[in-house]
Amino acid sequence: MTLLTASSRAAARLLGAKNSSCIIFAARHASTSTNLKDVLANMIPKEQARIKSFRQQYGSTVIGQITVDMLYGGMRGMKGLIYETSVLDPDEGIRFRGYSIPECQKLLPKAPGGAEPLPEGLFWLLVTGEIPSQEQVNWVSREWAKRAALPSHVVTMLDNFPTNLHPMSQLSAAVTALNSESTFARAYSEGISRTKYWEFIYEDSMDLIAKLPCIAAKIYRNLYREGSSIGAIDPALDWSHNFTNMLGYTDPQFIELMRLYLTIHSDHEGGNVSAHTSHLVGSALSDPYLAFAAAMNGLAGPLHGLANQEVLVWLTNLQKELGEDVSDQKLRDFIWNTLNSGRVVPGYGHAVLRKTDPRYTCQREFALKHLPKDPLFKLVAQLYKIVPNVLLEQGKAKNPWPNVDAHSGVLLQYYGMKEMNYYTVLFGVSRALGVLSQLIWSRALGFPLERPKSMSTDGLMVLVGAKSG
């Protein structure tokens, strides 16, 4: 009988140990300190030594092949990054430091009386690989509350943006302006040792995560609530609860939804646009504010962070055309018309996943519990029964199953947040938990400047022996 730590657990999953009866996966609660930085300081030398030994033994080992199609196809499937905080399994979905979403829902601490995991706990897990105690999560909540205040120039900036400036543009600009507060940029200019980089990246990351709800809430209030005040941070409340209050929502169910939303959107391994962007920009030793702002510019792209909006637009058009109570056959016909016109069914399929996205599943379970009779949810549930079969009949989709975007917008709409242009800002606030966790480790492990080799088409043709004419 073997008990696995978080890192060993993730490796065992990859090696197929999930079917072995001789292995028991144990939730790892190794550290007792409530100070996250102290816990990290103890972990980092051990991880540095582990990786150094691994590279000495296996540094020249070949791990895969690169094809011409990979270069032209967005580097899909190419193993080219180290990203510690999460791994995306095609069949099981995302694993945060080895833990699936259902496991995180079960093991991570909750708010008093709550049923959903607190994002503070997920952040602790991403940074340390350990399931935190309630006391450790409470420490993170208090720490973020202490660091949340915005500098006056950022407040002035947000209050003077034109109302036609997209919420994501406002988020990116405000985060960039926070660079004035960077402890890392200041320390780097003073010549700190490379071994100390991670300490200042940690401080900036904690500050940024703490301030993001204030920035995001201010954007929301300015655009959609006539500039009304976001109020003050309550140090007795958790991060999501404070964020929801500042947005102007007090429904306990919506607060629970926000805890779930901010947890499940936090990380999706390192190859997606926002995660890779933060890793790339951070490798130039840009501070976390600049790296995260760059990531948000990537998230703002329609192929990355706008998919949940596209789902809602498609659902709204469907309802307008067919009404609320639609037969399965009419839905099938509508889906086929969508496909035959050269469009896709938004919210279905994924670049890596080959099963239903577990982030979809947990949102579906939330809806079944809290809003089972909502017409839009009932439509989404009906589509879940029909769309995959139609896509399989069509024969083009590698993955006919729903992803996270097929559901999140419906839940937000139900609780009154109907401003679709804003949804990607929520996504961005959540994604900070993952990409900044990795940024801390990238500097702790001394990852170098990212600089892959590019090729021209002519050069590639010469390399493979093709005729260039």
Swiss-Prot record:
GO terms for cellular component: mitochondrial matrix. Pathway: Carbohydrate metabolism; tricarboxylic acid cycle; isocitrate from oxaloacetate: step 1/2. It catalyses: oxaloacetate + acetyl-CoA + H2O = citrate + CoA + H(+). PROSITE patterns: CITRATE_SYNTHASE (PS00480). It is found in: Mitochondrion matrix. Keywords: Mitochondrion, Transferase, Transit peptide, Tricarboxylic acid cycle. The keyword Transferase applies. This is Citrate synthase, mitochondrial. Gene3D superfamilies: Citrate Synthase, domain 1, Cytochrome P450-Terp, domain 2. Key enzyme of the Krebs tricarboxylic acid cycle which catalyzes the synthesis of citrate from acetyl coenzyme A and oxaloacetate. Homodimer. GO terms for biological process: carbohydrate metabolic process; citrate metabolic process; tricarboxylic acid cycle. The keyword Transferase applies. Residues 1-31 form a transit peptide. GO terms for molecular function: citrate (Si)-synthase activity; identical protein binding. SUPFAM superfamilies: Citrate synthase. Citrate synthase is found in nearly all cells capable of oxidative metabolism. It comes from Iguana iguana. InterPro entries: Citrate_synth-like_lrg_a-sub, Citrate_synth-like_sm_a-sub, Citrate_synthase, Citrate_synthase_AS, Citrate_synthase_euk, Citrate_synthase_sf. Oxaloacetate binds at residues 359, 431, 451. The lineage of its organism: Eukaryota, Metazoa, Chordata, Craniata, Vertebrata. The active site is at residues 304, 350, 405. Pfam families: Citrate_synt. Its EC number is 2.3.3.1. Belongs to the citrate synthase family.
